[in-house]
Amino acid sequence: MIGCIKTRLRRFLGDETGSAVLPFALWTPLIVGIALSTIEVGALTIRTTQLERSLDETVRTIRLNTDVAYTHEQLKTMICEGTSLLVGCEDTLRLEMVSLDMRDWVDPASRPDCVDTTFQQVTPQRAFSQGIAHEMMLLRACYMYTAFSPASYLANALPSDDQGYTAIIATAAFVHEPSSGGF
C-alpha cells in the first residue's frame, strides 16, 4: 500500500505536463499591470503637456492685451480651446488667479483651487483677481480627470478624490504690463 502511494507520488512529481501554466499565471498580471501603467503615464503626460501649453498661451495673451480685463470664464474658455484631449475641460477646469506682493511676501495657498466633483454645481470660486499694471500675478489651473485604466498600478498610486478624479495642476506667473487704459 505504501509502495503504491510512493510510486504514484514519484510519478506525479516527475511529470512536467502543465508546467508552463504556473509561470504564465504568475507573470501575466505583472506584465498587464506594467502595460496599463505605461499607457496611463503616456495619457497623463499628454494631458499635462496640453494643459501647460494652453495655460502658457493664455498667459501670453493676457500679457499682450493689457487693456482687457479677462473673466474666469473667458480664461477657462481660452485654455480649453487650446487643448484637444482634455475631456470635459469646461466642467472640470478651475482657475485661480491671485496677486503676489514681492515686497511683503505671503505664500499662496498650498492646495490649488480644484472643482469639487461631488457637487459640481456648487463649487465656489475661491480666488480670482484681475490685478493692476506692474503687479505680479499667479495663475493656477487645476484640471480633474478620471484615470484611463483604474486597474493600472499608476492609477492606484495617484491621489484621487472620492469620485476617482485625479488633479493635474499647471502654474504660471506673470507681470501685468502697463497699459494705456488700465484696469
Regions found by a protein language model. Give the residues of each.
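Alpha-helical assembly-interface signal, strongest on the long, hydrophobic N-terminal helix that forms
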Residues: 1-83
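Short, conserved structural patches
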Residues: 3, 56-183
